[in-house]
Amino acid sequence: MNTKTPVVVMVGCYLRQGRSVALEAAARFVQEGRQAVIVEGGPGTLVAPPGVELVQLAPGCVCCVGQLPLRVTVARMIRLIRPARLWIELSQADHLPELRKQLDGPGFAGAIDLQDAPQQFI
């Protein structure tokens, strides 16, 4: 892979609201290219706006019980979808250090560039 995929982790949002905030954020950046969003599972059905690929993982924390599904999903999205930016919704901010450790670890170090969420979404 020649370029790193920017990855933005949206934290501190609660389930239903957080998932829609992540989709809204991605939709605002569609002009830069295809966006991809990974959200924690929860009630209800989500519909991705045009230009946004959405994957909803099974309910549970993505860095604890959902660690393997998250890693597989990130790898597949980067390889197959090749998004201009990948957004990951994380509802509990106290899990951010563990998630960053996983994404900074072997397998992703040369493929992704972890970035802070744009100010308007914090």
Sequence positions of predicted segments:
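Phosphate/Mg2+-binding loops and adjacent switch elements
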Residues: 81, 93-122
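Flexible, charged surface loops at secondary-structure boundaries
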Residues: 1-5, 28-33, 49, 78-82
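Conserved nucleotide-sensing/catalytic segment adjacent to the nucleotide-binding pocket
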Residues: 39-41, 46, 50-88
